[in-house]
UniProtKB/Swiss-Prot annotation:
InterPro entries: Ribosomal_bL27 (IPR001684), Ribosomal_bL27_CS (IPR018261). It comes from Bifidobacterium animalis subsp. lactis (strain AD011). GO terms for cellular component: cytosolic large ribosomal subunit. PROSITE patterns: RIBOSOMAL_L27 (PS00831). This is Large ribosomal subunit protein bL27. NCBIfam families: L27. The lineage of its organism: Bacteria, Bacillati, Actinomycetota, Actinomycetes, Bifidobacteriales. The gene is rpmA. Residues 7-19 have a biased composition (Polar residues). HAMAP family: Ribosomal_bL27. Belongs to the bacterial ribosomal protein bL27 family. GO terms for molecular function: structural constituent of ribosome. Transmembrane segments: none annotated. SUPFAM superfamilies: Ribosomal L27 protein-like (SSF110324).
């Protein structure tokens, strides 16, 4: 008989990193050009006036102003309203 038992292996021990998605600047909040407004997978929110889209569908401000959420043609849209 063997002196040592076979070393058991665990099937656990893996976990993916959090993605930190979601709305970063809410309606009415002031933003500076370049601020991230929404981090998302796919276009849950679409870009409106003064809002750009990154390659991972991140929405960001193109101008200084206030964030405004709305609906146009059954799409949720994010605008940056400048004074």
């Amino acid at each position: 008989m063997a002196h040592k038992k076979g070393a058991s292996s665990s099937r656990n021990g893996r976990d993916s990193n959090p993605q930190y998605l979601g709305v970063k600047k809410f309606g009415g909040e002031a933003v500076v050009a370049g601020n991230i407004i929404v981090r998302q997978r796919g276009t849950k929110f679409h870009a409106g006036k003064n809002v750009g889209v990154g390659k991972d569908h991140t929405l960001f401000a193109l101008a200084d102003g206030n964030v405004q959420f709305g609906v146009r043609r059954d799409r949720k849209v994010v605008d940056v309203v400048t004074e």
